[in-house]
Curated annotation (Swiss-Prot):
<keyword id="KW-0820">tRNA-binding</keyword>
<comment type="function">
    <text>An aminoacyl-tRNA editing enzyme that deacylates mischarged D-aminoacyl-tRNAs. Also deacylates mischarged glycyl-tRNA(Ala), protecting cells against glycine mischarging by AlaRS. Acts via tRNA-based rather than protein-based catalysis; rejects L-amino acids rather than detecting D-amino acids in the active site. By recycling D-aminoacyl-tRNA to D-amino acids and free tRNA molecules, this enzyme counteracts the toxicity associated with the formation of D-aminoacyl-tRNA entities in vivo and helps enforce protein L-homochirality.</text>
</comment>
<protein>
    <recommendedName>
        <fullName>D-aminoacyl-tRNA deacylase</fullName>
        <ecNumber>3.1.1.96</ecNumber>
    </recommendedName>
</protein>
<dbReference type="GO" id="GO:0019478">
    <property type="term" value="P:D-amino acid catabolic process"/>
</dbReference>
<dbReference type="GO" id="GO:0005737">
    <property type="term" value="C:cytoplasm"/>
</dbReference>
<dbReference type="Pfam" id="PF02580">
    <property type="entry name" value="Tyr_Deacylase"/>
</dbReference>
<dbReference type="InterPro" id="IPR023509">
    <property type="entry name" value="DTD-like_sf"/>
</dbReference>
<comment type="similarity">
    <text>Belongs to the DTD family.</text>
</comment>
<feature type="short sequence motif" description="Gly-cisPro motif, important for rejection of L-amino acids">
    <location>
        <begin position="137"/>
        <end position="138"/>
    </location>
</feature>
<dbReference type="GO" id="GO:0106026">
    <property type="term" value="F:Gly-tRNA(Ala) deacylase activity"/>
</dbReference>
<dbReference type="GO" id="GO:0000049">
    <property type="term" value="F:tRNA binding"/>
</dbReference>
<dbReference type="InterPro" id="IPR003732">
    <property type="entry name" value="Daa-tRNA_deacyls_DTD"/>
</dbReference>
<keyword id="KW-0378">Hydrolase</keyword>
<comment type="subunit">
    <text>Homodimer.</text>
</comment>
<keyword id="KW-0963">Cytoplasm</keyword>
<dbReference type="GO" id="GO:0051500">
    <property type="term" value="F:D-tyrosyl-tRNA(Tyr) deacylase activity"/>
</dbReference>
<keyword id="KW-0694">RNA-binding</keyword>
């Protein structure tokens, strides 16, 4: 499982010209599910996301997590995140989970994020989406499990 996490001052995702998810201050999460992933791994990743300290405290130091900062989450499925790009000029998606496995794991991830009591917006699984964001910092981290 890979999650590209970006601290944003605003972000929204559109499908067919309609906004389906939007947040202000918070984290934009691009979520890639791999073949070997399971709910236990997703649960560990969620705990990591929620507790990751990427927001500035009153002294300007990155000491606050998304809860401390009063932030929200925008979760978007993105299978291209798990592409193998080490060889050639065409990405290989052989490690990406089949949608039959990936969809329930993505939905589990979203449910676990919501269970922490934070506002969570989402894209649409397997849809063609347009994502707009203002990266705050910029602050971007690749989380892998």
């Amino acid at each position: 499982m890979k999650v590209l996490m970006q601290r944003v001052s605003e972000a929204h995702v559109d499908v067919s010209g309609r906004t389906v998810g939007a947040i202000d201050n918070g984290l934009l999460l691009f979520i890639g599910i791999e073949k070997h992933d399971d709910t236990a791994l997703v649960d560990r990743m969620v705990e990591r996301i929620i507790g990751y300290r990427v927001f500035a405290d009153e002294r300007g130091k990155m000491n606050w997590d998304v809860r401390d900062a009063g932030g929200a989450l925008l979760a978007i499925s993105q299978f291209t995140l798990v592409a193998d790009t080490r060889k050639g000029r065409r990405p290989s998606f052989s490690s990406a989970a089949d949608p039959v496995l990936a969809r329930p794991l993505y939905e589990h991830c979203v449910a676990q994020l919501k269970a922490h009591g934070l506002p969570v917006a989402t894209g649409v699984f397997a849809a063609e989406m347009q994502v707009s964001l203002v990266n705050d910092g910029p602050v971007t981290f690749m989380l892998e499990m």
